[in-house]
Amino acid sequence: AFAPDHCKNNPAKRQAWAVDQVQKAAIASQKLGLSTSVSFTGSLAFPYLYPWPQRPDGLIEEAFEELGRRWRPILDHYKDRGVSIGFEIHPGEDVFDGATYEMFVNATGNHDCALINYDPSHFLLQQMDYLAFIDLYHDRINAFHVKDAEFNPDGRQGVYSGYQSWVNRAGRFRSLGDGQVDFAGIFSKLTQYGYDSWAVLEWECCIKSAEQGAAEGAPFIESHLIEPPKSAFDDFAGGDRDDAAISAMLGLSGRKP
């Protein structure tokens, strides 16, 4: 849908065009003074996520090996320009959770530019622990889509949402503050681990207008930004190391410091 006409119905030309566009994004990022960009991994294996008959042995492994072969030279191109890629963990792409991200990173040779664009909305709709995800992968997160969602299963539908319209789905995206995502917990976790990059409003709500979502969303994000303390609250009561005092406190006064 995005490719120019001369690439349509020609997979090889379309892929070459796409690689060129992604590489140009690295050059543009460098010229703009940006060190972070975002992308998707692409989908080779996702059509076989839940197959019947069962998929043949080696299918998933080969899909990820091919993803690695395609992405390694692109990631090298980004690294040469001082730019990293935050891959959005997103259903429909081959990388849609922590396990598949690990498979992808392994396929790239643990490339240090293959990072994560963290979007909790997709984790909530999969019923993942999106706070524990930060504990596991905080050192790989270089971008953050601040996007809300809610999941309200019932007797008729669950995670797959029964092909219903967005308004009628059990899982749906919401404007910031209207869903179920614990943003206070997320901003606290990211601050705890020293995150210092983007917090970008993403709006895809089926209930509230984009204009209202943007007007409310920007101050919502601002209200969640955390300024880390410059010192611990009880530092005033501490002091320099005093071996004699330590020995006395531990009842070791007869021992030489």
Give residue ranges: language-model regions.
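Hydrophobic residues within beta-strands of alpha/beta enzymes
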Residues: 37, 144, 198-199
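Terminal-tail/helix-coil boundary detector
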Residues: 226-257
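A short, acidic, flexible beta-alpha connecting loop/helix-capping segment that sits on the rim
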Residues: 200-210, 238
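Flexible loop residues that form catalytic
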Residues: 42, 149, 203-204
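Acidic/histidine-rich catalytic cores of soluble enzymes
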Residues: 62-64, 68-180, 229-233, 242
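C-terminal helical cap(s) of enzyme catalytic domains, especially alpha/beta-barrels
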Residues: 210-230
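Active-site acidic/histidine proton-transfer and metal-coordination neighborhood
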Residues: 2-115, 235, 250-255
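Short amphipathic alpha-helices and their capping/turn segments at secondary-structure boundaries
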Residues: 20-36, 72, 129-142, 184-192
